[in-house]
């Protein structure tokens, strides 16, 4: 995969894209009660956080997860408005290079 550092999604674009994907696929991949909980609580306690890909992604993909080009977005709920997300609904691995659309999701079980 040939990737260009100058052709990457910004951090905000990456978060927005991951959240859009989450909203599109959540109803098909989460328990209906979890979807309802997320929708009711998101305004107060919800969030999406951007990270370098965690090492356990290597169990799910067979390519190098260079943090210059790949990001993990965690979507879920926190105990408070400014707290860390501790109730994870999805972990989304995205390629930030605009010409390489790639996404893997680990859903809450």
Swiss-Prot record:
The name this protein carries in UniProt is Putative double-stranded DNA mimic protein YciU
Q: Which family does it belong to?
A: Belongs to the putative dsDNA mimic protein family.
Question: Pfam families attached here?
Answer: DUF440
The protein's job, in short, is:
May act as a double-stranded DNA (dsDNA) mimic. Probably regulates the activity of a dsDNA-binding protein.
Under NCBIfam families, the record lists: PRK05094.1
Q: What disulfide bonds does the UniProt entry report for this chain?
A: none
Q: Where are the transmembrane segments?
A: none
């Amino acid at each position: 995969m040939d990737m260009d550092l100058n052709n990457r999604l910004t951090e905000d674009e990456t978060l927005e894209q991951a959240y859009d994907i989450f909203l599109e696929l959540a109803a098909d991949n989460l328990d209906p009660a979890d979807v309802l909980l997320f929708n009711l609580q998101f305004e107060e306690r919800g969030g999406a956080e951007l990270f370098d890909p965690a090492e356990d992604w290597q169990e799910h993909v067979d390519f190098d997860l260079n943090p210059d080009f790949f990001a993990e977005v965690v979507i879920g709920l926190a105990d408070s408005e400014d707290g860390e997300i501790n109730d994870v609904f999805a972990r989304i691995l995205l390629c930030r290079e605009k010409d390489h659309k790639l996404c893997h999701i680990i859903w809450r079980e």
